């Protein structure tokens, strides 16, 4: 069975409203919360695969605000050189553009060849790898990283994310 992990209840509520039976779990915000939740969910629920779904900021303006993308790989932005391991997704949902992402604790960290940034992805993929559970990541871009917070389109991007998850979920049932 496939479970969907979503960082916040706000992001999850739209998916639950549209699809009450969706197998949604809350991952929490940030690397520590996402790692702990992912490990607990794997240990307690023994899923066949996991999909992390949430919003992200884009550093590359070729990625549109409100576009939904699949993350091919994640890096922890603040780690130096040899410690900057790339965590690859185990599968890519069909029909989505793929991007590289930085996992960071704050917005606007140097992009280093990535198109988007978020706060949970590398931790999620690292735990999936450690437990041998296939993991994928889907993100809806809510803003550009240099936009003021007042310009972020969180609700609209979360709505697009929910519609995309509903569309791809049958592929993994």
Language model: regions and residue ranges:
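Extreme N-terminal starter segment of soluble prokaryotic enzymes
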Residues: 1-3
């Amino acid at each position: 069975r496939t479970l969907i992990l979503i960082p916040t209840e706000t992001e999850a509520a739209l998916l639950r409203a549209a699809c009450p039976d969706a197998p949604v779990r809350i991952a929490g915000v940030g690397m520590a919360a996402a790692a702990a939740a992912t490990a607990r969910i794997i240990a307690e629920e023994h899923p066949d695969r996991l999909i992390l779904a949430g919003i992200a900021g884009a550093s590359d303006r070729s990625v549109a605000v409100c576009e939904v993308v699949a993350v091919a790989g994640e890096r922890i932005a603040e780690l130096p050189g040899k410690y900057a391991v790339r965590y690859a997704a185990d599968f890519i949902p069909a029909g989505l553009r793929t991007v590289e992402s930085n996992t960071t604790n704050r917005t606007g960290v140097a992009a280093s060849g990535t198109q988007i940034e978020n706060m949970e992805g590398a931790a999620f993929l690292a735990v999936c790898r450690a437990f041998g559970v296939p993991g994928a990541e889907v993100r809806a871009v809510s803003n550009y990283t240099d936009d003021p917070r007042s310009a972020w389109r969180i609700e609209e991007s979360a709505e697009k994310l929910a519609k995309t998850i509903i569309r791809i979920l049958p592929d993994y049932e």
